[in-house]
UniProtKB/Swiss-Prot annotation:
Gene Ontology CC terms: TAT protein transport complex
GO molecular function annotation: protein transmembrane transporter activity
Function, as annotated: Part of the twin-arginine translocation (Tat) system that transports large folded proteins containing a characteristic twin-arginine motif in their signal peptide across membranes. TatA could form the protein-conducting channel of the Tat system.
Domain of life: Bacteria
Membrane topology note: Single-pass membrane protein
Protein's UniProt name: Sec-independent protein translocase protein TatA
Transmembrane segments: 1-21
Main localisation: membrane
Pfam family name, one: TatA_B_E
Subcellular location: Cell inner membrane
Amino acid sequence: MGSFSIGHWLIVLAIIVLLFGAKKIPELAKGLGKGIKTFKAEMEDTTPEKSEKVEHKEESATSQKIEETTKNA
């Protein structure tokens, strides 16, 4: 009762075609696909940089602890 049936989806599709026109829908889908592809590419580009920064910070923190320990000893 709460989910969409095939009839509901056909009505939604008909409304979309009426609003945008049959020629405009493929262009919109193509633009959406390019946007998603660009977003994923940017996410993959930034991921290695962040992990390198985290590793560098961890190494810095570890080296500082070692220096403090040797100074106190």
